[in-house]
């Protein structure tokens, strides 16, 4: 296996290779550091690369391998989004208004370390993870490895660009309105938005008033499942807790799903949002593959409910809360300060009403799954946008732009149920497109099983972006 092939093998395979002593942790870290130095100047995926620290951790991991330790991610280099606390580093949050270095890891980072992973760097995001593109005044614009004139998506665009370009085995991500699924779709990756409460957000009991969850961007479905097995489970202080799975998620990735009823629809859940031809074609092609695999494919537009009256108050108030928590809020971008000002007008009573609406909306949307086991939609309604599309635009224009990207993603942040974005069978003008599989509440397992079956048929892990 040559160096390039090794860089793209992904999390699960690299963990197997380390256990079998086919490759050493030090070799993996050195490989990725060389690639980051050579390729990341074209992408701006990383806010900071932890070279010396990662090399030291790799040497420690080699000792653990030699001692026979069996940890699921032992010696595998991963990237973490720069809204997670990493002891000894500052958490940038895409902003010049950040505080100084923190003294302890977030719960997700602690669990990654416990599983044996090596943190190779922290990846970029838009300021406070607000928008579905990864561009900030403080840390620059993250570009798509498939076409560097296009966006990597957001807000987990740094992690997605890094994994897609073979700069890390996998990357952490978070999702308050599509921020895992959108960059996964833009960069040709698997993006698993977990069930609310599946992965602890501590030191925050919740984020954006229940909208945000944690997950990953990965090359394969098995990678996503192995990651989830390593980091999932409750922690003291969590507001939400997901029902435990019947079996490990990695086992679901290796188990066929059986024949499922799959509803497919390219109609936007949000009125007046245009769905472009490539997004419709991605759904059509995926439906054909699902049909060939023996599933019952139902072409029907589900009866959604418009979730914006629950989503928007929580999103805006969440931005205000995050801005209020920054040590130097005057250093926030003008657009962020404006959005935070709007959010501060939403009081506790308005928040309670938004959460009450969630319960009614969730009950109505649940009826969709009386007719199917899985719903398939586009992930985003258009191909990846141009980098800098919203430069100089005010908060209202940018928010409208975000709304035109997120109609298929925000409903599932309101309901809290899991969804996974996977690459469509074909590229469009050399760019990836994504489709989203949505499952019943607490049922990542069915989504993982079906997505792995699709992956085996479509073969997206073999694709390589031209940036290398």
Task: Please report, for each region that a protein language model flagged, where it lies by residue.
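An N-terminal boundary/leader segment
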Residues: 1-55, 266, 292-294, 463-468
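Glycine-rich, small-residue loops and helix-cap segments
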Residues: 21, 32, 75, 114, ...
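Acyltransferase
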Residues: 22-30, 59, 248, 277-301, ...
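Residue-level signal for inorganic ion chemistry
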Residues: 32, 54, 224, 262, ...
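Acidic/His- and Gly-rich active-site-bordering loop/insert found
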Residues: 54, 64-137
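Short helix-loop capping/hinge segments that flank enzyme active sites or metal/cofactor-binding pockets
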Residues: 73-93, 251-267, 298, 316-366, ...
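Short glycine/serine-rich loop segments
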Residues: 104-235, 413-434
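A short helix-breaking turn/cap at a secondary-structure junction
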Residues: 193-281, 449, 457-468
């Amino acid at each position: 296996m040559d160096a390039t092939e090794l860089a793209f093998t992904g999390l699960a395979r690299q963990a197997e290779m380390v256990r079998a002593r086919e490759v050493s942790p030090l070799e993996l870290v050195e490989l990725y550091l060389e690639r980051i130095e050579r390729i990341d100047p074209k992408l701006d995926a990383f806010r900071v690369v932890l070279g010396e620290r990662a090399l030291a951790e790799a040497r420690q991991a080699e000792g653990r391998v030699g001692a026979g330790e069996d940890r699921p991610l032992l010696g595998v280099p991963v990237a973490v989004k720069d809204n997670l606390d990493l002891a000894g580093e500052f958490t940038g949050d895409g902003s010049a208004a950040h505080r100084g270095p923190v003294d302890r890891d977030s719960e997700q980072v602690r669990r990654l370390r416990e599983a044996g992973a090596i943190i190779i760097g922290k990846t970029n995001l838009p300021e406070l993870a607000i928008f579905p593109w990864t561009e900030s005044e403080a840390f620059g614009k993250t570009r798509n490895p498939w076409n560097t004139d296009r966006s990597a998506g957001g807000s987990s665009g740094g992690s997605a660009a890094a994994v897609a370009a073979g700069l890390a085995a996998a990357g952490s991500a978070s999702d308050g309105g599509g921020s895992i699924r959108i960059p996964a779709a833009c960069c040709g990756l698997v993006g698993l938005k977990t069930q609310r409460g599946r992965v602890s957000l501590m030191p925050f009991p919740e984020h954006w008033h229940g909208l945000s969850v944690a997950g990953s961007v990965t090359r394969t479905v098995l990678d996503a499942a192995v990651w989830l097995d390593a980091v999932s489970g409750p922690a003291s202080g969590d507001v939400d807790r997901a029902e435990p799975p019947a079996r490990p998620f990695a086992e679901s990735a290796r188990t066929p799903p059986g024949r499922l009823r799959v509803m497919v629809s390219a109609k936007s859940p949000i009125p007046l949002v245009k769905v472009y031809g490539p997004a419709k074609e991605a759904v059509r092609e995926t439906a054909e593959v699902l049909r060939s695999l023996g599933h019952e494919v139902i072409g029907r537009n589900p009866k959604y409910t418009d979730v914006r009256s629950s989503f928007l108050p929580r999103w805006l108030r969440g931005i205000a809360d995050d801005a209020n928590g920054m040590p130097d809020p005057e250093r926030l971008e003008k657009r962020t300060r404006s959005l935070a000002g709007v959010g501060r007008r939403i009081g506790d009573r308005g928040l309670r009403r938004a959460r009450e609406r969630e319960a009614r909306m969730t009950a109505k949307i649940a009826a969709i799954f009386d007719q199917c086991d899985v719903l398939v939609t586009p992930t985003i309604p258009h191909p990846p946008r141009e980098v800098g599309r919203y430069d100089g635009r005010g908060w209202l224009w940018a928010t409208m732009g975000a709304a035109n990207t997120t109609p298929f993603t925000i409903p599932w942040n309101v309901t809290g149920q899991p969804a996974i974005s996977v690459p469509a069978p074909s590229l469009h003008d050399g760019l990836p497109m994504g489709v989203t599989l949505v499952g019943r509440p607490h049922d990542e397992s069915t989504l993982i099983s079906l997505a792995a079956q699709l992956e085996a048929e479509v073969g997206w892990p073999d694709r390589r972006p031209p940036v290398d």
